Amino acid sequence: MSDLSAICRRSLGPALVLALLAAAPLGQAVTLFSYGADWKLWRGKKAPSRPDYWAWTKANHDDSDWEIAQTPVFYGEKVTGGTELEDMKSRYISFFLRRKFDCPDPDTITSMTLRTKVDDGFVAYINGTEVARHNVETDKPKYNTPASKAATEPLRYRSYALKNFGDVLVNGENTIAVIVLNQRRTSPDALFDARLTAVSVESVPPEVKTVDPPSGLASSLGRVSVTFSEPVSGVDAADLLA
């Protein structure tokens, strides 16, 4: 998997994401955002959007009054970094997260995976459409909805293949929104962190346009220049030897 953790703490521009997808070997996942990223945070003391309760899941929702929080968002857990919700225990049962990510050419993406660590449950939406959930049985959970059961300790990362990503992604900027729920208000802990990856397959691979010097017999050879039909990366001399 391409290691983009450092740059994925902030939103990637469409051109950079497209370049990363194109440069990755066929079938290799590229990280769209990683663990420890910055999100927008709403503490679940009241509904995050009114009068349309579900507006918070949509790309055009105004979240300018939400806090900025680095994941993991948590309380009662032994973690390094992140954002601690010191006021959550016994006061509210949920929190909400939103962040943008870029997808410059959805038609080239063959799979997407959301990998999370969560305590207790969550439901994730992309551009207003549900794409993944865990430990939440309520069809449309609200800020006062409990998780269906407590998380199993110790917490482990779980992966969710997003089967309907092709129907919800748009070309360019997209928004993922997540509600995180505890089983009860007095739960001793809560946590959420996530990473989103995509696999892209190019329909037409790059071609070799010119080779200098041209093929033939040579008594000695110090350098060969190869020109491709488009920019490539990760190619060395061994890849070009017959």
Feature annotation, model-predicted:
Residues 13-23:
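Bacterial N-terminal signal peptides
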Residues 214-220:
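Short, solvent-exposed loop/linker segments at the N-terminal edge
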Residues 223-242:
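Short, surface-exposed alpha-helix to beta-strand junction/turn motifs within ectodomains of secreted
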Residues 59-98:
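Surface-exposed, low-complexity/disordered Ser/Thr/Gly/Pro/Asn-rich loops and linkers
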Residues 39, 66, 93, 101, ...:
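Aromatic-lined ligand-binding clefts that engage carbohydrates, nucleic acids, or primary amines
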Residues 137, 146-201:
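An acidic-aromatic loop/edge-strand motif
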Residues 204-211:
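Proline-enriched interdomain boundary motifs that mark the N-terminal boundary
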